[in-house]
Amino acid sequence: MSNDSTTAKLGCVIALAAAWAVAPPAAAAAPLDAVVEQLVLEAEAANLELAGAEQGVAQRLAVLDQARARFLPALDLGMRYSMADGGRQIDIPVGDLLNPVYASLNSLLAASGQPAPFTPIDNVSVPFLREEELQAVVSLTQPVYDARIPAAKRAAEHEYIASRQGLDALRVRLRRDMQQAWFRWLALRESAAVLDASLEAARENQRVNESLHRNGRVTRDLVLRAEADVLEIEQQLEATNGAQRIARNYVNLLRNQPLEAPLPEAAVSDADVARRRDALVRQAGGVARDRGWLQDTAVERRQELRQIDSGIEAAGAAEDLARAAFRPQLALAVDAGVQSEELGFEGDENFVLASLVLRFNFYNGGADRAALREARARSGELLAARDLAEQHVRLEVLESVKDFEVAEASLRTAAKRVAAADGAFGIARRKRDLGQIAQVEFIDARRAVTSAQLNQQVNRFQALSALAAVEYAVGGPVRSAPPPETGP
């Protein structure tokens, strides 16, 4: 084997490997947008955190139903049948009181020749407990005035609305997290493909140098250098494959699938970044780079802020609830039933009792005033949290837009870097074929191509992840066109 033919063969192998590394994914891969929407829908349907939040909304709705029910009358049925033996006796001295009177009357009547009609009577002893007693009562209670009831209803309504807005905010965050997790997995997959191609080329270079060394054409240092090059790429590939598995596990965690389940693939290019950027610009009415408008839009659309707003309204209702303790409560109560010594619902034992019940608390140790202070402090806490959250949202918009601009610029630079590295590698390959370049310089040229390709893959998916962050920062996908731009 001649040195020229061997190096020419090596050049062909490395060139083919480099071409394979930068080749686009297979045509069978699905379009990017379709796969993104598929994964988002799967996550929204099965994500465990989202399912828990939905149950939280159902809980707040049940609390609201309870608050509404307090406006309606309460109807209760109570029945009691008792048997008693013994117990206290109530002694009534009827005989002691009336018998002397009866005796005097009988004497007067006898003196006038009339019969004595009055007979002595015994004292009466009444048992405190009846031997048998049946009591059945139907009670109807209707609040007439109670300031606590409407205040509690308003608080429950706003808490329910806040829980729904929190659920919507979680959906938007889940959409961002799913996109970014999947883009990270794609980036690692593409990086592994580049490293695989580079590893094959490095192994071929090692085999060629070992053959040349056996034939006495090169020294041992070139063989060791080629071996070190292979080991370096293997180490990088092992780390990349491990990170790829972790990224896949996280995507499957978000969509509640087995962690090792395969993920859908998609063909991704720089054109996809530009297309998704333009789509976001169109959704924003052509003012996606207007940071002021984006900040105002985010403040208007972010469900986290709406959730805090509803919490503030609920805290205001809680203040009204605390103030209601200083007002009277008036209720209507109607009881209808029977109290009898025998089983049955007939006779004179039936009764109906209607009452207006007024309750007003004058003093309970200052607990009501403390509850009012607590409610006011809660309102103040939420107002401060609302201002802080709005500042965070505005800052998040600025950071996400800036991150995308940096990623977009880096992507353009990465494309130029790949072109420059490819050109330099082509020149190095021709010099190598002419025997005008050292082996170490040729390996460095190959490394430059690999590094440029890896950098391009990373920047491409970083740009897509940054776009997902911008979409999240402004409140998710814009469903309707915004007002026309008025700022500069």
Report the location of each language-model feature:
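Bacterial N-terminal signal peptides
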Residues: 11-23
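Amphipathic alpha-helical coiled-coil segments
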Residues: 40, 52-67, 170, 174-195, ...
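Periplasmic alpha-helical coiled-coil/stalk elements that build and connect Gram-negative outer-membrane
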Residues: 3, 165, 169-297, 400-403, ...
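Bacterial N-terminal signal peptides that target proteins for export
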Residues: 2-13
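Transmembrane beta-barrel architecture of outer-membrane proteins
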Residues: 38, 133-135, 180, 225, ...
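Small/polar, glycine/serine/threonine/aspartate-rich low-complexity segments that form flexible
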Residues: 30-32, 78-138, 269-287, 320, ...
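A glycine-/polar-enriched beta->alpha junction
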Residues: 41-51, 58-75, 121-130, 137-155, ...
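Bacterial Sec-pathway N-terminal export signals of envelope proteins
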Residues: 27-89, 94, 133, 142-143, ...
